[in-house]
Amino acid sequence: MAPTSKTSPPRLGKPLKRAFFGRSVREVAHDLIGATMLVDGVGGLIVEVEAYHHTEPAAHSYNGPTPRNHVMFGPPGFAYVYRSYGIHWCVNFVCEAEGSAAAVLIRALEPTHGIAAMRRRRHLQDVHALCSGPGKLTEALGITIAHNALPLDRPPIALHARTEDLEVATGIRIGITKAVELPWRYGVKGSKFLSKPFPK
């Protein structure tokens, strides 16, 4: 449950090192659920993600490297930030060995740290809606193209392993028209902070 102004944020788990991201993108996506993501101390629990790999046509990297997606082809453990539909920034974590061009899209957070800052940035009070989508969470955390290619284990970005057991739901990815059958969306089952509920 997200903290209020009268409660303290939950304790943080061990910092995630870049080596964490050198595994299968689907394993990383699953294991990121419940981890804490912070940018300059503002963030929360990762409750929803999607995995992408260059071998499937929904991935930005499917047709090879471009000036936009070149970070995906680099080493694991770095942020890949792009603008979606010319409006919202989206943040991804590069995974697998260099050249694999795989990444995890962060879709939703449960706010736990810096909620006041999130509310100012989003001009919104409802804590459940602050980070319930990839564009919403980047606005709440102040993520822009300036964060592209930054390491995930150094300031301003910090990632911490989950500290509690939880049930991870899986399903098909959202808002794509290709490779729609792949169950590469992961999230906290029953969370009220998702961009969209998982089918029951």
From Swiss-Prot:
Keywords attached to this entry: DNA damage, DNA repair, Hydrolase
InterPro entries (UniProt xref): Formyl_transferase-like_C_sf, MPG, MPG_sf
Pfam families linked to this entry: Pur_DNA_glyco
CDD domains to which the protein is assigned, alphabetical: AAG
GO molecular function, one term: DNA binding
Entry keyword DNA damage: yes
Highest taxon in the source lineage: Bacteria
Record GO biological process: base-excision repair
Alphabetical list of SUPFAM superfamilies matching this protein: FMT C-terminal domain-like
Class of this enzyme: hydrolase
EC number(s) given by UniProt: 3.2.2.-
UniProt-listed PANTHER family: DNA-3-METHYLADENINE GLYCOSYLASE
Family per similarity comment: Belongs to the DNA glycosylase MPG family.
Protein name (Swiss-Prot/TrEMBL): Putative 3-methyladenine DNA glycosylase
Organism in which the protein naturally occurs: Bradyrhizobium diazoefficiens (strain JCM 10833 / BCRC 13528 / IAM 13628 / NBRC 14792 / USDA 110)
